[in-house]
Amino acid sequence: MRRRQDQAPPRAGEQVRVDLGRANLLAAHQLRQRQQRAQYGLTLRGGVEVHHADQQLQERADGAEPVDQHGPPCLVGIRVQRRGQLEQRGDRRGQLVPGHHLLDGRPHPFQALHFRRRDLPGVGVDLLARGVEHDLERGRQLRRRPLHARQRLQLLLRALALRPGQQLRRDQHLQQVQRVVHRPRREVHGGGQQRRQAASVGVPAQQRRLAVHPVPGQLRQPARRYPRHINGAHSERGDLLRPLQRPLHLRTRHPHRPAPQPVQLRDPLPGRHRPAKESSTARCPVLSIPCRLSHSRWFAASRTEATSLVSVVTPGSSTRRSLSHPAAASNNAFGPSPVVQARASTHSRSSPSASANSRYSKTRRSSRTCSSRVFSRSPYSFSTDGSPMSSCSAR
């Protein structure tokens, strides 16, 4: 189909009259050339020979079509696509042609027919075989023809390639190149292209973990290296130093940059500053305090101070007396609690020989058990018969 350059391109759904006389002439020339090559044992590469055949055909001076044409022009329906919408063919040359066509399965020469860009400048078209009109006589002639005569037009137009100046318009070739260049690269972890510094010999660096968020304050620290990765026989001095002493550390290389926040390692807090952990420890059954604290010097001093502030109300009077004052008679004081009685019955020092010195020895000696330490400063002492006896004195 020959169209003038100043003529407007066809619109969508427009019926265009196609003259296949020149195309059939090219097909006949290529078929003869193919037969000659097959006769001499050569192969037809396709491409260069087709272009030479195109140059050998001379048009008539009056502009009429060549005489060797197989039939009158047929009416073909075309579908206009967007400008520059091309696809790449699967041949070895990789030329770009307009989009795929639709085949109806009938043996007519309009199968696989592709318009070239010089025939329809600036428009990518897609031929539809449904618009082809065949009369009965024309259909009978096509059926009588041999197979190679029906397919020669298809063989020719599949081998034709677009010229370099007609493949892409404007900056479409730049867009295709950008799609290839700007394609995301395949990231190879541990490769040399990801190292900004010189690699150490014999020390494999830790691979990057892209899915883990960085820790605040450790963004500018160097790559961590596990101690088992360091080979002392082949490692450098900078790999065996601390992070801040390495020569490649950012704090050493760029002193004007603020140093990263160091990781603060604090000592464990003492027991008196951890009230939450006291609930999980074992408690003394008498004073309801942790057994650990009852053995410490700080708790012994605080217990003495707390004991001096406790007031006891006797049954015969309404006055309060401190335990630091001389105690009242045994008949006016409170009796021992059940815990004290149980302690008195099982105490190892309740023998008659040790009862005389029990008042002074209990304040100076301490047993290995928690109960003996708790009752070492008890305000009650016990006689040989087990009766309580006040032992409070002003200290």
From Swiss-Prot:
Per UniProt, the keywords (alphabetical) are: Transposable element
| Listed Basic residues bias regions | 248-257
- List, as start-end ranges, the regions of compositional bias called Low complexity: 342-360
Q: Superkingdom of this entry's organism?
A: Bacteria
Region (Disordered) location: 185-282, 316-372
What is the protein named? Uncharacterized 44.4 kDa protein in transposon Tn4556
- The scientific name of the source species is Streptomyces fradiae
